[in-house]
Structure formats: structure tokens, C-alpha cells
A protein has these predicted regions:
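Active-site charged/polar residues at nucleotide-handling catalytic sites that mediate phosphoryl
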Residues: 20
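A short, conserved alpha-helix within the catalytic core of class I
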Residues: 13-15, 31-51, 55-58
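Conserved acidic residues
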Residues: 23
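C-terminal helical/coil "lid" or tail adjacent to the Rossmann-like core of SAM-dependent
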Residues: 113-158
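Core SAM-dependent methyltransferase catalytic element
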Residues: 164-175
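Conserved catalytic/acceptor-binding region of the Class I
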Residues: 51-116
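S-adenosyl-L-methionine
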Residues: 1-17
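A conserved beta-strand element that flanks and buttresses the S-adenosyl-L-methionine
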Residues: 26
Length: 175
């Protein structure tokens, strides 16, 4: 078994990275930040290499906070709007990325397995909860869909837990 890691600027395409015909291509916490076009091209390169594929922690749109608050849905909606902005790879797929990845691999004859891998947060994850809350507030503010006072109010809420949904995807060439 030989494992290699390569640091590359993927915004220029992944074809050259896969010229060595790897057996497995992996990524983590990435595909919700890239465009549907990038995903289509990426999958095409993996298929051309006849490699297996595994990605973990692709955000799938589930964002639940505890205790719940009436402002949650407004902040989450603004967060999802922000998710769709360009992060350097075109308009991001955001929560649609897991389905788009699976569809593209299936279209290309791959066998796809998906599984949910949510972050189930509780009071022992206080720092992570605070960081996620701050990220949601910053993203919501950036969209200008939420006024600053509302975002500040939501950000100051005491949260003791929540669920942040992710999907893991594994794909192998069929037949």
C-alpha cells in the first residue's frame, strides 16, 4: 500500500493531479464549497482515472440548534444563501453537493454508497458550538439578508447542542 499526498490548486482542474492513475481519490469537507460544474469536471477526471472515490463531511443542509429559537430558520436560510456564493470554484453547490456528487458518479456507471455523518453536538462541545454559531452569524451578515441587530441577537443566544448534517460518499467503478 502506497499513500501519497499532493498539495495542488484545484481551481485549475484536477486532471493533472490524477495523471498518475491513483486507486483512490479522497477529500474532506470540500464539495459543498465548489460549483456543480467543478463537481462534474472532478467526477469526470476520477472516472477517467478509473479510481475509487471517498469524501467525508460534505454539508447536506441540516442545521439544527438546541435549544431552538424562532430566529433559527432565518439565520440558517441566510447561511445557505451564503453557502451558494463563489469560494473560488464558481457558485458553490452548498447543501446540494452530496446529491450532485452521487448523481454524477451514477451517470458515469459508478456504484455509489452514501451515509449520513452528522455532528451531534452537546454541552461538551461548547467551543465548537460557539465557533459554528459565529460562522453562521458572519455568513448571514455577509448576505445582508439578516439585519445586524438580528444576527447579533441570534449569535448571543446560549446554545447547548445541535446537529450539523454531513454526508459521506463512496463510489467505485461499476462492472
Amino acid at each position: 500500500l502506497e499513500v501519497t499526498f499532493e498539495k495542488r490548486d484545484l481551481s485549475r482542474g484536477v486532471g493533472p493531479v490524477l495523471e498518475s492513475k491513483p486507486d483512490l481519490v479522497t477529500a474532506a469537507a470540500f464539495f459543498d464549497l465548489v460549483s456543480s460544474d467543478f463537481i462534474r469536471s472532478f467526477v469526470g477526471s476520477v472516472v477517467e482515472a478509473r479510481a475509487a472515490f471517498l469524501t467525508v463531511l460534505t454539508y447536506n443542509g441540516i442545521s439544527q440548534w438546541a435549544p431552538r429559537h424562532p430566529l433559527d430558520q432565518s439565520i440558517i436560510s441566510a447561511f445557505h444563501h451564503h453557502q451558494a456564493t463563489d469560494k473560488g470554484f464558481g457558485p458553490a453547490s452548498g447543501p446540494t453537493a452530496p446529491a450532485h456528487l452521487a448523481d454524477q458518479f451514477k451517470i458515469n456507471g459508478y456504484i455509489v454508497s452514501e451515509g449520513d455523518s452528522p455532528w451531534r453536538l452537546n454541552d461538551s462541545h461548547a467551543q465548537l458550538i460557539a465557533d459554528l454559531r459565529a460562522g453562521h452569524v458572519a455568513a448571514a451578515r455577509d448576505t445582508k439578508l439578516i439585519d445586524a441587530d438580528t444576527a447579533t441577537k441570534w449569535g448571543a443566544l446560549d446554545r447547548t447542542g445541535g446537529v450539523i448534517g454531513h454526508t459521506d460518499t463512496f463510489a467505485v467503478p461499476g462492472g
